[in-house]
């Protein structure tokens, strides 16, 4: 993968903690908290610094929106996790229904 393509990869850990926090309108402490709650797991650089991907930032931003509405961080992380699990279950259910012959 070329260096330019890495920034187009939603899973490439391109952002430092400070830049990631700035991009989602949060603090580094918030990113540490959602990491400790298990919502996201940033990659660690060789120097031990956290690096975040665009996908991880989208997930963290969803939690931040809930926290901004008054939800505790751990509860917000759990809500986001459950929403994603439900979306995945619905997607799988739809795939299975689509592969079932009509009238079966």
What are these regions (language model features)?
Residues 27-30:
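Short coil turns linking two alpha-helices in DNA-binding domains
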Residues 18-19, 24:
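N-terminal cationic amphipathic segment used for targeting or macromolecule association
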Residues 17-18, 32:
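Residues within the helices of the helix-turn-helix
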Residues 2-13, 22, 36, 41-42, ...:
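Arg/Lys-rich, alpha-helical DNA-contact motif
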């Amino acid at each position: 993968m070329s260096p330019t393509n890495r920034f187009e990869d939603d899973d490439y850990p391109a952002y430092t903690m400070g830049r990631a926090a700035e991009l989602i309108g949060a603090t580094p402490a918030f990113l540490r908290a959602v990491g400790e709650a298990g919502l996201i797991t940033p990659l660690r650089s060789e120097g031990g610094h956290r690096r975040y991907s665009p996908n991880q930032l989208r997930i963290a931003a969803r939690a931040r929106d809930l926290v901004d509405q008054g939800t505790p961080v751990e509860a917000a992380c759990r809500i986001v996790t459950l929403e994603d699990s439900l979306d995945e279950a619905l997607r799988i259910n739809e795939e299975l229904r689509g592969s079932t012959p009509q009238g079966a």
